């Protein structure tokens, strides 16, 4: 803005000078130069243009008069001075312009620096924000780490306490080990004797069981033939009854069609009679109206007596026809009622016959059920024989590995000690202890250097290898026993719960002989069912004895020497009860030689007081509570 104002002032000054010189050049007075020469002074130049003010020039112009050539020369010198002044001012102006340009450049540089500083400040603010976010995340992570450290410290304390408890338990188990080894020496002698006895008895039991199974199969075949014959007879009777019923149905349909036709004809006749009655009533009403009309004033012709008699006869005839029609209607209504009653009776007879047919069909189905039941039982017998063969093969394999029954008992007790010793290494011991409680298995003898980890790992590998075969045997036996008991009880319960209660009476009275006296095919079927029940009960008892002998010879220490853990576990589990199958087994269980010995009693008490010290739930295989299930 300052430069523009200066330029404008310069331009205005130049214009004024030009105008001034154009006006005052020929009229310059001479006295002015003289005065200037005498005085020797130069008139002051104005800052705006360096020229004299117009008032002085005007006064000089009016004072002096006409100009001359001398005065023109005198005037040229101040003009030159003024031109020099103008040149100096232009130089100054150019310098000022250069300074202004340099200032503008400096201003641009300063603005550029300010922008760069603003960008740097923004970047610094962003970096500060990111640093604040990182600081917050680090604080949160620090808090999480502190909580994790707190939980870790708690878990470490808990693990330390558990390790102390496990160390105490290990010490106690090592103390019990010596006592158990002393008790084992007493058990070995008794187990050897029992193993020898059971090995000799197992063959006799197998042969006897095979004979029983063959006899049962023969009985079942005979019963199946009888049932097939009775079933064929019942089918023939059913066909005859069906034919008879179909013939009766055809007859009744014919009769019903005839009766319906008769009813239709009677209805038509009734309608015709009703129409006739209506016509007669109309004619009577007309005659009555004619009789009631007044006589005309003219003397009417007197009807003759013949006409009167004729009219009376017609009235009598019409009255007789009406009475006959009424009687016919009453007779037709009675016939209709009788026909309706007959139809109802016929419908009731048909309904009763249908009910009888349904009862016969149900009886046939019930008689056909025992045949399917016995077929299923035959298939079950075959499957049980196959399972027995598999069990024998597995027992032979185990017999090759475990030569003596005493070593088996030793292996069980030492395995419990090993399962108690394992928790000292970590939490894996608790898992192994729980597995041992679920499925106790015979284990080999424990090595003496249990404290070394290498010996423990090799020992556990050996235990796993030995446990696989025993697990297979246990699973097969459990599967066989559960399957046999459930199926047998289902079939026997089904046979006992037949309608009429005759199967139960026949089972209690003696099969065919007493059921036959009750009459008919139902007695024969009930007697056959009772014979099947008796045969299967004998077979079931023999099969239990055989499996008990085989199981005791292979895995169990004997019916007379149950483990202390088994005695405690049978009370804890409600669905597992120690139920002996024969009275001899009960006597042996009561006369337990281990419980009478003073060395075994403290061991049993120790296991009862300390259930965590390897007290595995060793329940015998034949202790399933199947009798309460059957009572339910």
Swiss-Prot record:
Q: Name one GO biological process term.
A: Golgi organization
Compositional bias, Gly residues, is annotated for 508-520
Instruction: Give the Polar residues compositional bias ranges.
Output: 38-50
The portions of this protein that span the membrane are none
| Keywords attached to this entry | Coiled coil
Does the UniProt entry include the keyword Heme? no
Coiled-coil annotated residue ranges, if any:
85-150, 209-421
Region (Disordered) residue ranges read: 1-76, 423-445, 505-524, 552-573
Which PANTHER family does the protein's record reference?
Answer: GOLGIN SUBFAMILY A MEMBER 8H-RELATED (PTHR10881:SF62), GOLGIN SUBFAMILY A MEMBER-RELATED (PTHR10881)
By sequence similarity, the record places it as follows:
Belongs to the GOLGA8 family.
Protein name (record): Golgin subfamily A member 8N
Give the organism, scientific name.
Homo sapiens
Lineage, please?
Eukaryota, Metazoa, Chordata, Craniata, Vertebrata
């Amino acid at each position: 803005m300052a430069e523009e104002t200066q330029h404008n002032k310069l331009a205005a000054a130049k214009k004024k000078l030009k105008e001034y010189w154009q006006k005052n050049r020929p009229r310059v007075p001479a006295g002015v130069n003289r005065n200037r020469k005498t005085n020797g002074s130069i008139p002051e130049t104005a800052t705006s243009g360096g020229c004299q003010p117009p008032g002085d020039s005007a006064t000089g112009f009016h004072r002096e008069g006409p100009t001359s050539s001398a005065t023109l020369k005198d005037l040229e010198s101040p003009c030159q001075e003024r031109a020099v002044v103008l040149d100096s001012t232009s130089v100054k102006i150019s310098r000022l312009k250069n300074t202004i340009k340099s200032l503008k450049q400096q201003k641009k540089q300063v603005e550029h620096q300010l922008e760069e500083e603003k960008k740097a400040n923004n970047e610094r603010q962003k970096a500060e924000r990111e640093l604040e976010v990182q600081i917050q995340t680090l604080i949160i992570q620090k808090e999480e780490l502190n909580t994790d450290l707190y939980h870790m410290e708690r878990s470490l304390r808990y693990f330390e306490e558990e390790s102390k408890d496990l160390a105490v338990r290990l010490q106690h188990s090592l103390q019990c080990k010596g006592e158990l080894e002393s008790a084992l020496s007493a058990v070995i002698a008794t187990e050897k004797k029992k193993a020898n006895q059971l090995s000799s008895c197992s063959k006799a039991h197998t042969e006897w069981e095979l004979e029983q199974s063959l006899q049962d199969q023969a009985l079942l075949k005979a019963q199946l033939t009888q049932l097939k014959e009775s079933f064929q007879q019942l089918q023939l009777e059913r066909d005859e009854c069906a034919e008879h019923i179909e013939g009766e149905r055809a007859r009744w349909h014919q009769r019903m069609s005839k009766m319906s036709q008769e009813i239709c004809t009677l209805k038509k006749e009734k309608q015709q009679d009703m129409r006739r009655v209506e016509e007669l009533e109309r004619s009577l009403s007309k005659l009555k109206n004619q009789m009631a009309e007044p006589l005309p004033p003219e003397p009417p012709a007197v009807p003759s007596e013949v006409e009167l008699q004729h009219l009376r006869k017609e009235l009598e005839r019409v009255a007789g026809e009406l009475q006959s029609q009424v009687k016919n209607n009453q007779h037709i209504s009675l016939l209709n009622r009788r026909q309706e009653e007959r139809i109802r009776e016929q419908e009731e007879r048909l309904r009763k016959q249908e009910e009888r047919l349904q009862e016969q069909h149900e009886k046939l189905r019930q008689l056909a059920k025992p045949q399917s039941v016995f077929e299923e039982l035959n298939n079950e017998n075959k499957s049980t024989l196959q399972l027995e063969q598999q069990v024998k093969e597995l027992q032979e394999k185990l017999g090759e590995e475990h030569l003596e029954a005493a070593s088996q008992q030793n292996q069980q007790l030492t395995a419990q000690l090993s399962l108690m010793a394992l928790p000292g290494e970590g939490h894996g011991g608790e898992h192994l202890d729980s597995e041992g409680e679920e499925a106790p298995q015979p284990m080999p003898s424990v090595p003496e250097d249990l404290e070394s980890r290498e010996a423990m790992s090799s020992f556990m590998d050996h235990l796993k290898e030995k446990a696989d075969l025993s697990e297979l045997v246990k699973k097969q036996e459990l599967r066989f026993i559960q399957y046999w008991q459930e199926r047998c009880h289902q079939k026997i319960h089904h046979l006992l719960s037949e309608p009429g209660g005759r199967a139960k009476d026949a089972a209690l009275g003696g099969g065919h002989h007493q059921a036959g006296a009750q009459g008919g095919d139902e007695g024969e079927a009930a007697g056959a069912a009772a014979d099947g029940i008796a045969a299967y009960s004998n077979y079931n008892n023999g099969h239990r004895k055989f499996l008990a002998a085989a199981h005791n010879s292979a895995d169990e220490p004997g019916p007379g020497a149950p483990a202390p853990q088994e005695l405690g576990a049978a009370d804890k589990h409600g669905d597992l009860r120690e139920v002996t199958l024969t009275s001899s087994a009960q006597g042996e269980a009561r006369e337990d030689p281990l419980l009478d010995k003073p060395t075994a009693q403290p061991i049993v008490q120790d296991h009862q007081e300390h259930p965590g010290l390897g007290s595995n739930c060793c329940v015998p295989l034949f202790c399933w509570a199947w009798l309460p299930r059957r009572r339910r």
